[in-house]
Amino acid sequence: MSVGMGIDLEAFRKSQRADGFASILAIGTANPPNVVDQSTYPDYYFRVTNNEDNTDLKDKFKRICERSAIKKRHMYLTEEILKKNPELCAFLEVPSLDTRQAMLAAEVPRLGKEAAEKAIEEWGQPKSRITHLIFCTTTTPDLPGADFEVAKLLGLHPSVKRVGVFQHGCFAGGTVLRLAKDLAENNRGARVLVVCSENTAVTFRGPSETHLDGLVGLALFGDGASALIVGADPIPQVEKPCFEIVWTAQTVVPNSDGAISGKLREVGLTFQLKGAVPDLISTNIEKCLVEAFSQFNISDWNQLFWIAHPGGHAILDQVEASLNLDPTKLRATRHVMSEYGNMSSACVHFILDETRKASRQNGCSTSGGGFQMGVLFGFGPGLTVETVVLKSIPFP
């Protein structure tokens, strides 16, 4: 259709669209330097929160940590910080939100910047080529948001188009890929910087006999940030894609209200986790796979490479059993969980990074461990599932 003085708006619309799928062009990760050993964490935790006399509860926490399949985690909160801010070590008795947010407002963008700089360095292109920024966190609700702060720390151009993804939790690592795909494929030449930065200072608190799900969270979560450069139609010989984002979906698991939830209050973000979560995910995940891969005539889930959010070892065990997966399929997920714990939205990007690196080190033919097609799953509050179909890139 032509309008005005011979302007062809339809041609203009088509010219704005990319030709190919969005690709992940670079990945960067970052963690705080403070490392917590899971085997000694119960003793440390009950000491710094002044609960050493509660030996029965400490024994329960030890068993939770022993069953977590986690070796170590990175945490911003050190013993020195906790001693200076004892309100963080109370359970729900003392308001602490101001203290937490003062920390998070600085640390969340800072760690995000660190991951972003690594991704930009790998990408090898000037920051001036970044057209969009997607920033994700489940921590700080300040205005302007952490997206603004990261853009400022990185020195991005003021015209970079920002999108904030806040309070989504563990499924958001898939959400940001879905958004990045839409932005990259509908804006020719766009280069989208995706940053996820998560910090457990928002949830750390003392123990309680009446809130054992809080102890589960304290045994699982760690701090980390991830960053990716996403764009369609990579420049040959200049940009080096590692995965293509083929298809995305989001769904809410039936009858799962309240299975995973968090409430931001004066005492920080309180965490609720029901024991039914592994069952809910494992009994519904095949529906997501069928929806995603029937259009590609794929029904053998062992013919995919897997990037699954490590919500906990019970979830992974039940998914593996329900789908009869080869144990190698979740190897990268289990490795990241073991070394870093559950870093919420950033986790699946760490697993993507681990998958491509292990694939090259092991002499595989593609970035997906020798497989062409793969799936990325994010699980989180709702209970929400993000499904992302990925295509690997052949190694030269």
UniProtKB/Swiss-Prot annotation:
Chain positions of site Responsible for the different enzymatic properties of STS1 and STS2: H313
Subunit architecture: Homodimer.
Pfam families assigned to the protein according to its UniProt record, in alphabetical order: Chal_sti_synt_C (PF02797), Chal_sti_synt_N (PF00195)
Cellular localisation: Cytoplasm
Name the UniProt record assigns to this protein: Pinosylvin synthase 1
Domain of life: Eukaryota
Molecular function (Gene Ontology), one example: pinosylvin synthase activity
Active site: residue positions: C170
Entries under InterPro entries matching the protein: Chalcone/stilbene_synt_C, Chalcone/stilbene_synt_N, Chalcone/stilbene_synthase_AS, Polyketide_synthase_type-III, Thiolase-like
Gene: STS1
Annotated disulfide bonds: none
Induction remarks: By stress.
Signal sequence bounds: none
Similarity section: Belongs to the thiolase-like superfamily. Chalcone/stilbene synthases family.
